[in-house]
Amino acid sequence: MDIDKNKRFGLTDEQVKQSREQYGRNVLTPPHRTSLWKLYLDKYRDPIIQILLVAAFVSLILAFIEHNFMETIGIFVAVFLATTVGFYFERDAAKKFNVLTALSEEQPVKVRRGGKVMQIPRHDIVVGDVVLIEVGDEVPADGELLVSTDLQINESTLTGEPITEKNTEGGGDGAYPRNVILRSTMVMNGRGEFVVTAVGDATEIGKVAQKSTEQTSVKTPLYVQLDKLASMISKVGSVVSVAAFVIFLVHDILTNPAWGGKDYFYMAEIVLDYFMMAVTLIVMAVPEGLPMAITLSLALNMRRMLKSNNLVRKLHACETMGAVTVICTDKTGTLTQNQMQVDELLPKDDNQHLLDVAIAINSTAELDEDKAIGNPTESALLLWLKSQDKDYRELRHQAKVLKQQPFSTEKKYMATIAEVDGEKYLLVKGAPEIVLDLCEMEERYRNQALRELDEWQHKAMRTLAFAYRRIDRGEAASEKSVPTIGQLLSAKDFTLQALVAITDPIRKDVPAAVKECRHAGIEVKVVTGDTAATAMEIGKQIGVFEDEAENIGADGDMTSLDQQMITGEQWEALSDEEAYKRAKDIRVMSRARPTDKQRLVAMLQKHGEVVAVTGDGTNDAPALHYAHVGLSLGSGTSVAKEASDMTLLDDSFKSIANAVMWGRSLYRNLQRFLFFQLVVNVTALLLVLGGSIIGTEMPLTVTQILWVNLIMDTFAALALASLPPSHEVMNDKPRKATDFIINKGMAFGILFCGIAFFIVMFAMLIYCERRGKGGVDVHELTVFFTTFVMIQFWNLFNAKSLGSNRTAFRHFLKDKGMILVLALVLVGQWLIVTFGGEMFRTVPLSLTEWLVIIGATSIVLWVGEIWRAFKRLLVKRKN
């Protein structure tokens, strides 16, 4: 298919089909992934698994001599299950993450097809398409420019050049001609149109496979903390296991006459048994279920957060959102509905046609029927033209654009030199204070305009002004001699055309969400480009000034409204020391530029705050990078999304509050799992040590402990990780990022429960030891083992209610994961007891014995329920 570079109509549907068949889809081949077998074998690199395998092979050698393979088979089965279950869940989490990252290929791109501008997913672009790009867009495919207006591209992903000037003429001394633009580069300034020349793997980025093969693996703060915890527990477990090994072996040498003989094989077997016990103690001490619990929690949270309009791009964002203390939010789209409409337009000049042309050409937005594509403010103006029965496309066709300076947040205006009805004009649209400063007008008219603007701004309306200046024939004898826009602006003799008030209503759920965040101890700060009056009104409407009693500054004094508000210009003028002092008191920053937002984030972080920032524009990228959690908007630019950790698909502040709840609930669920597993570990360690002291047979065998620790804890991780988020966590104040995951209350609970369970189980062991003539028999040890498992079974209910005074049965029927796990543990224990035999050192129990054990051990749950009811009563009396 020939590509006509001068073609502005775009492809027809038939041409699109032909191009896709010939050149393929605009999708990069995914990077080579590690095979499933390698991923699975990686699970066997775990030091604990390797120790178990060594023990299992030694046991296997002895089993061949003794012809008793049951324990060996039990160990191999336990290792296989532990590695396979871990592999399955990690693989499942990876698949879920791949599904989420694939959504980036759905990113909308503006193209012209059949003469109309429309949005299509990035992967639907074909060779020959005419693509429209502007500031903040990621170039979706390779192509050659048709139209270029002050276009600057960041080609650092390919050439290392951060800024490259682009035009339609080509040439230049760069790595690529100036009229060539490449996939995955970023538009930093201006706008343009290009015809696609290569898609997918045929693009330059596809050839070098640079971006597509990036594989990053960053350890999150929580992982680092849990690594320390696992290391500490491993050391304790190692000391205990060595001590138990020595005590058991010395006791056996002193009491067993076989050590005086020459049966070296029997002696080796005894040493192996105690070695296996020592290894098992290490296995018991190390919380192997932790990585799985984290993986599960993150994977489940990511999937559920997607349903609540939070697309998590970086895993650490899940956990960090739970520790956020300050949210710096934009106004447009996040706090408002992002459905802008012209509320009022006051003409200040008689030339209505010139105003219509100014609105049409001083804009990068497009309309697809009534659907707006592009900047919401500019879209509102085009919709206003349509409501006046005027076609913006026809107006653009009537005017010949000679030069154009795109809108930027730094300059706060857009300017276009155009020829209209044979005359040349400089047409300016922008912030009223900038545009009015360019205009030549009587003071009374200027004051009237300022009063009108002030009235609108106090109603939280966005205001714009339009002005023009006729370019005299003496200034421009020909098109080539058109002076620069900067030269014309310096004259300051413009004529004011119109003042415009654009309204964007506050989202209905935002005030409640802000209140919820403040109740949760999170400060909300509004950082907006609007005027001080507009920003203050927005702040009042959403409730950041809601309770004057709470307006206490960082120094403990009441802060006035003046101290809580600041403009970007005032903020820039402050020294670092002054800015540091004021940062915490600021509630609203108006007329803010991206650099102001970044500086505010930096100062808040110096105070030790954990900061989340929203941003939708390219210039927000530095602040999004700087923040602990960068939150881009679904409607934002590609650059902003690239810099962010999470994307708010619906742009709403309510989604930020939800993300905080998810983050805190995730942390709480991990604490619940830790509580459950460490209680099991403490109880088992004390039992084995206690058994060594009184000289009885090991109360729990290697295979029994492996079942409890590797398999049952895996089920517990699944149950507790799948618990839904709770709004209760929003009643707490934010945790410090440095806080240890096991707080004082948890540590007390772990030790209390662990010691209490040990006392009960140890008393049972001594009773059985003294009652029987030949020590504890297999039947009694089976009852002992089942009692131990059932105590942990009921304690899972207490773990579910950790950090809450609510009953463990609240929403029980909705917790399907919990019900499934409880059923699996019960069925698994029954199968082991009934059919485990020599492998698990068990004999079948009668129905009566099962009922007695289940009933007696349920006291663990009922004591917990009484304690929670007592705490509820205390809270009720306090309130």
Place the predicted regions along the sequence by residue.
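Conserved cytosolic headpiece of P-type ATPases
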Residues: 1-734, 739-742, 755, 770, ...
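Generic alpha-helical transmembrane segments
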Residues: 712, 757-758, 782-797
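Alpha-helical transmembrane segments of multi-pass integral membrane proteins
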Residues: 749-764, 790
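Long hydrophobic segments that form regular secondary structure
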Residues: 766, 771-772, 776
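Transmembrane alpha-helix entry/boundary detector in multi-pass membrane proteins
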Residues: 777-781
